[in-house]
A protein has these predicted regions:
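Outer membrane beta-barrel
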Residues: 1-11, 23-157, 172, 181-188
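Gram-negative outer-membrane beta-barrel proteins
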Residues: 9-19, 58-64, 95-99, 156-162, ...
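Flexible, solvent-exposed coil segments and beta strand-coil junctions
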Residues: 14-17, 115-118, 156, 251-258
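Glutamate identity and glutamate-enriched acidic tracts
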Residues: 15, 29, 42, 86, ...
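Flexible, surface-exposed loop regions and adjacent strand-edge segments
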Residues: 19-20, 68-71, 105-110, 207-209, ...
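Outer-membrane beta-barrel domain signature
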Residues: 23-27, 61-67, 122-129, 160-169, ...
């Protein structure tokens, strides 16, 4: 059992504003989110192990859960592996996030804020799929040298019917990410390919919520270099039909309202 209760102060000033404000650090704005984590691990012999991990994030000022409807919103996964590779099944984050379990930003030291500060942290301004249910993931376990990671989720929507019809499957949100890279003593690099098929589950009356959205394709090129104290990192990002900026599908707040997004088949193209 492990966990943390973290809070702090930070100064925030919007560009063009006359004054800034001093605020308490909230969820995603600290080096680690306040959380409780339960981990169990069993040695199977011959270098193999298996286990389970449950993690819940909460607000330290009120004690309330971060996500309504989830007892363990951050992680609820089973894993099995050895010294070379690990496989996970359940609910977990994708690869382009700040935290556990398979963050490529963390692996390459590319997230210098160690949090999700708005406008600064890469996980908050480029594609990341959020926490994924019904996910399968893998990661090689080498501490240095070549690494490979991947994750796939067939959707976490609770809308629509429970029958596994072809339409139900095709209308659920699907996410896949694949990454490979190299970590050395000083230089660390990685490339991440991301795919998202936006969900289009029917409303209760049988109608669709809007136009069918085109699939998102995105690529991150990531690198960092440690000079033995000071370090520098950089990320090049390109995407086609992006529907989210960070973990939230909130493109409507950027391009001029929900009607614009709902009636469009194409998302943003970024470079």
């Amino acid at each position: 059992m492990s966990g943390s209760v973290i809070t702090g102060l930070y100064f925030n000033k919007v560009e063009g504003a006359d004054n800034g404000s001093l605020k308490m650090g909230g969820m995603g704005e600290l080096p680690d989110d306040p959380h409780l984590m339960l981990t169990a691990r069993e040695d199977l012999g011959n270098g193999w192990y298996t286990g389970a991990q449950l993690q819940n994030r909460f607000y330290p000022d009120s004690g309330t859960f971060r996500s309504n409807g989830y007892l363990f919103d951050a992680q609820s996964r089973l894993f099995v592996g050895n010294d070379q590779i690990e496989f996970s099944f359940g609910r977990m984050a994708g690869l382009t996030v700040a935290g556990r379990p398979y963050s490529v930003y963390g692996k390459t030291n590319a997230n210098m804020t160690f949090a999700s500060l708005g406008g600064i942290a890469p996980a908050n301004i480029m594609f990341q799929p959020g926490d994924l249910s019904n996910a399968i993931a893998f990661s090689t376990n080498a501490q240095s040298g070549l690494f490979v990671r991947g994750v796939y989720s067939n959707g976490d929507s609770v809308n629509g019917t429970d029958t596994e019809t072809t339409e139900d499957w095709s209308d659920r949100r699907h996410v896949a990410q694949f990454s490979t890279g190299w970590t050395g003593d000083h230089l660390k690099t990685a490339v991440v390919y991301s795919f998202e098929m936006p969900g289009n589950v029917k409303n209760a009356d049988g109608t669709r919520p809007g136009e069918r959205k085109k699939n998102t394709h995105a690529v991150h090129l990531i690198a960092s270099y440690d000079f033995g104290g000071p370090a520098v990192s950089g990320i090049l990002y390109a995407s086609q039909n992006d529907w989210r900026i960070g973990p939230v599908n909130d493109l409507s707040a950027i391009v001029g309202g929900s009607d614009v997004v709902s009636n469009s088949e194409e998302g943003l193209d970024n470079l």
